[in-house]
Amino acid sequence: MDGSDGARRVLVINSGSSSLKFQLVDPEFGVAASTGIVERIGEESSPVPDHDAALRRAFDMLAGDGVDLNTAGLVAVGHRVVHGGNTFYRPTVLDDAVIARLHELSELAPLHNPPALQGIEVARRLLPDIAHVAVFDTGFFHDLPPAAATYAIDRELADRWQIRRYGFHGTSHRYVSEQAAAFLDRPLRGLKQIVLHLGNGCSASAIAGTRPLDTSMGLTPLEGLVMGTRSGDIDPSIVSYLCHTAGMGVDDVESMLNHRSGVVGLSGVRDFRRLRELIESGDGAAQLAYSVFTHRLRKYIGAYLAVLGHTDVISFTAGIGENDAAVRRDAVSGMEELGIVLDERRNLAGGKGARQISADDSPITVLVVPTNEELAIARDCVRVLGG
């Protein structure tokens, strides 16, 4: 591939602690010229010892797809950054000063921001003549109403340490809400929506027009819905209780809540296909995990129906939301009195692209809307660079 077609492309990088995902995107037409993932970064016996090696391998994979970044019309590298704190909430061109400030904010997202910064620093070194832009997961939720963003704790402490509800998966929630409006051929500003991003990480949002009114994740991505490995909402006293009675350290409890809780903590597996197999075999732990997951999901749907007052559309997205018809059914079954009438035939039918799964006479339209965070990030990059 060369730039002779005149297309402008953005290389989108999502750098995690043990994996690096990449996609070369044409932001105008939404076409991905190449996509891939480098895994097992830094693991023992892994051929990818660090993020420098990971990005070089990604470049090799791009070359294998016929992509030469020097001639591919590359105009920007977009980096997904989970947490921007109160400082960064719009797409931001990366320079040394911005990166230094992001390092200072890593305490707010110690599991996510440091590997993202490693990816940024390597990418800037390997592609020094291209603009690098950070797009923040927290950005869309920066302007949550104070009643939703504020925790009822000591105000002085909260202000001093920037403790508030930040929300995450914001790029996905914004993109899906826009795609839902386009699918319905209705103005975005006139719609009230609930978006359910259900993957290994899960989050919900209530959105009025272009403004989010609430979201399930909080100071960190640990709060809210039950997830693959994360607990979601718990009584905060569980932390001190385990420290005092089980002799665990705070870091140990935090690690347990992030990595050994949620569906995997209850059932031993986090893949919903495997969970379904265990349920069908009569595994009680798997059934309990599924019941806890859907119970929490239904609670948030009900809460956000109340927050919005009137709801036009509910959209399911991400890996589970897009592909698991049973989760969608169990999330809204019995809610006919609340205006949600699912069409089970439509729900079971597959298909690509956005599709309606509610009955035609359902007061609230229910959709499946594939997310595309990479495309949204690419478009944000072009926008901030004045393209």
From Swiss-Prot:
Residues engaged in binding substrate: R80
Residue(s) at site: Transition state stabilizer: H169, R230
Cofactor: Mg(2+); Mn(2+)
EC number(s) per entry: 2.7.2.1
Record: residues binding ATP: K21, H197, L198, G199, N200, G201, D271, F272, R273, G319, I320, G321, E322, N323
Summary of subunit composition and partner proteins: Homodimer.
Protein name: Acetate kinase
Source species: Mycolicibacterium paratuberculosis (strain ATCC BAA-968 / K-10) (Mycobacterium paratuberculosis)
